[in-house]
A protein has these predicted regions:
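Alpha-helical transmembrane segments and their membrane-interface boundaries
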Residues: 1-77
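Gly/Ser-rich oxyanion-binding loop with an adjacent helix/lid
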Residues: 88, 92-99, 106, 110-123
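Ligand-binding beta-strand-loop-alpha-helix segment within the catalytic cores
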Residues: 60-62, 80-90
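C-terminal ends of transmembrane helices
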Residues: 28-39, 90-102
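Small-residue-rich segments of transmembrane alpha-helices in multi-pass membrane proteins
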Residues: 48-58, 82, 109-122
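Interhelical loops and loop-helix junctions of multi-pass membrane transporters/channels
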Residues: 66-80, 84, 101-106, 110-114
Length: 123
């Protein structure tokens, strides 16, 4: 498969780069706030999460270009739905319960929201 032809037919290289860059910036903004509050997930986590979610959405939307016209059915929305499931497990990992105190709910919600922002930017 010629990747240059693939990118020109579906999404431009600059548009792909801008989408990933904006996802990086959005993840950085959320991560900076979490870092200033010295929470579990900081800048690096949120940037990686936003960029990975955006990239996965780009792949789910444009990655099955070579299957067009074949008998194979590809449903890119399945990939997106699994991002939500995976991020939910990641978010659950930062929630701690000690006695009657629950910590990490806001960070978990931030992780989930960051993934959603990345998905929206990649779609």
């Amino acid at each position: 498969m010629n990747w240059q032809t693939f990118l020109e037919a579906t999404i431009g290289q600059w548009e792909l780069l801008v989408r990933l860059l904006v996802a990086c910036i959005c993840g950085c903004v959320i991560g900076v706030e979490r870092s200033f509050r010295q929470k579990e997930a900081g800048i690096r986590t949120h940037v990686i999460l936003a960029m990975a979610s955006a990239l996965i959405m780009v792949v789910s939307k444009y990655g099955f270009f070579d299957l067009a016209g074949t008998n194979m059915n590809a449903d890119g929305s399945r990939i997106a739905s699994n991002i939500v499931t995976g991020i939910s497990f990641l978010g659950a990992g930062v929630i701690f319960v000690r006695g009657g105190s629950i910590k990490g709910l806001t960070t978990a919600a931030g992780i989930w929201a960051t993934a959603g922002i990345g998905m929206a930017l990649g779609a």
